From Swiss-Prot:
Belongs to the universal ribosomal protein uL16 family. GO terms for molecular function: structural constituent of ribosome. The keyword Ribosomal protein applies. GO terms for cellular component: ribonucleoprotein complex; ribosome. HAMAP family: Ribosomal_uL16_arch. Gene3D superfamilies: Ribosomal protein L10e/L16. NCBIfam families: PRK04199.1-3, PRK04199.1-4. This is Large ribosomal subunit protein uL16. PANTHER family: 60S RIBOSOMAL PROTEIN L10.
Length: 173
């Protein structure tokens, strides 16, 4: 079956469907890592990508954005000069009532009978001004980090903006 376009799952139409205990066969999340880069060092600058509208972000879109941001950061900044973190998790299970197409589909298809649907993926439900991705880095890499996060934001279904904050670093060690 063909995967449906992401715009079909973008809106928060119903309440969250997360109880996997009662579901059979929920596909696993495609997100491989939630933290990348230099995890041991503390950085003075925090740059976050926050969404401007409430929406559902599919796990495939989160993974695509993660790959885009991480690759750009590795090329332009280097692994030792940043800490990249995904701040949301795709808990919401997406369902789809599969429809048969082609010759003889009318004999095979059930139509709207038992139309609850099967689990086809997961999504993160986000609210306005919620941070989705965060990069911690040094002062000299702010512009390159902003560029990387902007590229990752193009993969999300909601418009997004960048928020830059200074973090006090503890140097007493």
């Amino acid at each position: 079956m063909v995967r449906k376009p992401g715009k079909m799952y973008r809106n928060l139409a119903k309440k969250a469907y997360t109880r996997r205990k009662y579901m059979g066969g929920v596909p696993g999340s495609k997100i491989v890592q939630f933290e990348m880069g230099n995890l041991s060092q503390e950085f003075p600058v925090e740059i976050s990508l926050e969404v401007l509208e409430s929406c559902q972000i599919r796990h495939t879109a989160l993974e695509a954005a993660r790959i885009a941001i991480n690759r750009k950061m590795m090329d332009q900044v280097g692994r030792a000069n940043f800490h990249f973190k995904i701040r949301t998790y795709p808990h919401h299970v997406l369902r789809e009532n599969k429809q048969a197409t082609g010759a003889g589909a009318d004999r095979v298809s059930e139509g709207m009978r038992m139309a609850f649907g099967k689990a086809v993926g997961t999504a993160a439900r986000v609210q306005p001004k919620q941070k989705v991705f965060t990069v911690y880095t040094n002062e000299q890499y702010i512009e390159k980090s902003k560029d990387a996060l902007r590229h990752g934001g193009y993969k999300l279904p909601s418009p997004a903006r960048l928020v830059i904050e200074r973090v006090p670093v503890d140097n007493t060690q």
